[in-house]
Amino acid sequence: KLAPSEMYSGIALPEISKLASANAYLGAFPIAEALAQGADIVITGRCVDSAVTLGACIHEFGWSADDWDKLACGTLAGHILECGPQTTGGNFTDWEQIIADGIDGIVDIGYPIADLSADGSFVVGKPKATGGLVSIGTVSEQMLYEIGDPQAYIVPDVVCDFSTVKIVQEGPDRVHVSGATGYPATDTYKVSVTYADGFRGGVLRTLYGIDADKKAQVYVDAVLARARNTLRGSNLGDFSETSI
């Protein structure tokens, strides 16, 4: 009989009758299979964020389930892309570099792009004429974001060691990434479970680092400016009230 528990605290989960949902985080190979069958767009259930990039790599380059190092590199590429403009400075410690030429550096921040090669190495960039920054610092911070142990980042298809990664600045807003090491995947999946126990809603945005209060104000101004640009583009009026 299964006795599932919360992965961090070890606390037992409620009785099955109280569970509202349970979703296993799947990997990249089902996405690659869908592409192999001719899909132009793949609609999937819960999967790890990096799987959408790794699945495309597996399909394009023909990587196998035991190409551990390549799978780790593809996972890293997906991890670098998965949070969008965090990689281009959206939550960078040295945030003042992003607004060196004005707040438009954040308001018009560009999303990251990865040009991948068959050996697993890739170059991170962003569209021209967009704000933000692609540097060793921005890419390195995203590499370490939410991975736990950098020598054992576990996803369904591979266990990744990012301590061997090499990151080199190739030019303005172009960073070359290579050298991730992979090991065989575990025999378990992470599962997200929800259960009914009342309701609570809220949004918390954490900003940290040097001059965090000033950083927070700049980001608030940028969020409102970006939202107002969207409203104007849709021929809608301004906010009647804002409270931050």
Question: Each predicted region: which residue ranges?
Answer:
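An acidic, phosphate/nucleotide-engaging active-site surface
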Residues: 1-44
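A glycine- and small-aliphatic-rich helix-loop capping segment at beta-alpha/alpha-beta transitions
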Residues: 2, 56-67
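Conserved active-site and cofactor/substrate-binding residues in soluble primary-metabolism enzymes
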Residues: 26-30, 37, 71-75, 134, ...
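FAD-binding core of FAD-dependent oxidoreductases
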Residues: 33, 40-60, 75, 79-80
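Flexible loop/turn segments at secondary-structure boundaries
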Residues: 50-52, 88, 199-200, 212
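Short acidic (Asp/Glu) and glycine-rich catalytic loops that position anionic groups and cofactors
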Residues: 55-60, 116-126, 195-205
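A conserved active-site cap/scaffold subdomain adjacent to cofactor or substrate pockets
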Residues: 71-179
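C-terminal catalytic subdomain
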Residues: 150-152, 167-243
